[in-house]
Each structure stands twice: as structure tokens, then as C-alpha cells.
């Protein structure tokens, strides 16, 4: 199809436009990424935040959701019954969030593999002799006997079952040698 006739002018750079402000405003208006996957999948971009959260059964403002009780004015039982319950159209989001919250928390603190190997090596070769451990050539960081003892105690505290298995294996080795 032929091009429509008319004046075409070249694009000129707009020097009068403040690009810094334009970019800042664009960043402010851009919708943030919703971290919670349950909420993100149920989100309707055509609706407002308040409408979306109301459909999911979540509160926009926690202060309004659970207000402080006022001691002077007591609500009558009739008033409480007359208040309409909000309709929850997406209850599965609320159920998923509650199920996720009820799961046991993962143990986040662990020791590095290097520290575990270091402790095992020291105990394997020196037993309870911390001074000999401090003089060992594998003591790269030149830990003092007390520092080595504390590292071993940390290992015992973090992995008590593994520590017991390790000690049992050492006992078996000693029995085999004798």
C-alpha cells in the first residue's frame, strides 16, 4: 500500500524536556513486582489495590481490619449483626497463604563445608588435644586452642546426630586397630 502523502519532518531532540524527572515519574508510576506468588497469580491489573485485596479476603489497612476497642462506646449486638460481611471471591489465595504460614520454618543456619571438614580432621587426628590442634599444619588461620574448641562446640550444637555418628565411627576404628 502506498504511503499517504503529506509533510514528514525529521525527529528533533527535545532539549526543553527534563529527562531526569520523566524517568523518575515513570519509575514511580510503574507497578512493583508482587513477591508473593499466590497474590501475584490472582491479581487483576484492571482493578485497584483495595478491590484486589478485598476479593482475596485480605485487608488493605490492618488498623481498620482489627481496630482498637474503644472503652467508652460499646457496640450493641444488633449493630454487629447488621454489618455486612464482605464477599470473598478468591478464597483460595487466603487458604494458600494460611497453609504456607502453618508450615514449619526451615532451619536457615548451617555451617560451611570447609568448617565441618576442618573440625572432623582435627578431632580425627588429635582427639581432645586442643594444643596439638593449634600446632597442626592444617590450622591455616592459626586458631588458638580456645577458638578451635569453640568451633568444635558449634559443630556439636548444630549437628548433634552427625557428631554422635562421627564419634561412633572413630570408636570403631580404634577397636579395629587394637
Swiss-Prot record:
<dbReference type="Pfam" id="PF09420">
    <property type="entry name" value="Nop16"/>
</dbReference>
<dbReference type="InterPro" id="IPR019002">
    <property type="entry name" value="Ribosome_biogenesis_Nop16"/>
</dbReference>
<dbReference type="GO" id="GO:0042273">
    <property type="term" value="P:ribosomal large subunit biogenesis"/>
</dbReference>
<keyword id="KW-1017">Isopeptide bond</keyword>
<feature type="modified residue" description="Phosphothreonine">
    <location>
        <position position="8"/>
    </location>
</feature>
<feature type="modified residue" description="Phosphothreonine">
    <location>
        <position position="144"/>
    </location>
</feature>
<keyword id="KW-0539">Nucleus</keyword>
<keyword id="KW-0007">Acetylation</keyword>
<comment type="similarity">
    <text>Belongs to the NOP16 family.</text>
</comment>
<dbReference type="GO" id="GO:0005654">
    <property type="term" value="C:nucleoplasm"/>
</dbReference>
<feature type="region of interest" description="Disordered">
    <location>
        <begin position="1"/>
        <end position="31"/>
    </location>
</feature>
<feature type="modified residue" description="Phosphoserine">
    <location>
        <position position="16"/>
    </location>
</feature>
<feature type="cross-link" description="Glycyl lysine isopeptide (Lys-Gly) (interchain with G-Cter in SUMO2)">
    <location>
        <position position="74"/>
    </location>
</feature>
<dbReference type="GO" id="GO:0043231">
    <property type="term" value="C:intracellular membrane-bounded organelle"/>
</dbReference>
<dbReference type="GO" id="GO:0003723">
    <property type="term" value="F:RNA binding"/>
</dbReference>
<keyword id="KW-0597">Phosphoprotein</keyword>
<keyword id="KW-0832">Ubl conjugation</keyword>
<dbReference type="GO" id="GO:0005730">
    <property type="term" value="C:nucleolus"/>
</dbReference>
<feature type="modified residue" description="N6-acetyllysine">
    <location>
        <position position="90"/>
    </location>
</feature>
<protein>
    <recommendedName>
        <fullName>Nucleolar protein 16</fullName>
    </recommendedName>
</protein>
Amino acid at each position: 500500500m502506498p504511503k499517504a502523502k503529506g509533510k514528514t519532518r525529521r525527529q528533533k531532540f527535545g532539549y526543553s524536556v527534563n529527562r531526569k524527572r520523566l524517568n523518575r515519574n515513570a519509575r514511580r508510576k510503574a507497578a512493583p513486582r508482587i513477591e508473593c506468588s499466590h497474590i501475584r497469580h490472582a491479581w487483576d491489573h484492571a482493578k485497584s489495590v483495595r478491590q484486589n485485596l478485598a476479593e482475596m479476603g485480605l485487608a488493605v489497612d490492618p488498623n481498620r481490619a482489627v481496630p482498637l476497642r474503644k472503652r467508652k462506646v460499646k457496640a450493641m449486638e444488633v449493630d454487629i449483626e447488621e454489618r455486612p460481611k464482605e464477599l470473598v471471591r478468591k478464597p483460595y489465595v487466603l487458604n494458600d497463604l494460611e497453609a504456607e504460614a502453618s508450615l514449619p520454618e526451615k532451619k536457615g543456619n548451617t555451617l560451611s563445608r570447609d568448617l565441618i571438614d576442618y573440625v572432623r580432621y582435627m578431632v580425627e587426628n588429635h582427639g581432645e588435644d586442643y594444643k596439638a590442634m593449634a600446632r597442626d599444619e592444617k590450622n591455616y588461620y592459626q586458631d588458638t586452642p580456645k577458638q578451635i574448641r569453640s568451633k568444635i562446640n558449634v559443630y556439636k550444637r548444630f549437628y548433634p546426630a552427625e557428631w554422635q555418628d562421627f564419634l561412633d565411627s572413630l570408636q570403631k576404628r580404634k577397636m579395629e586397630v587394637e
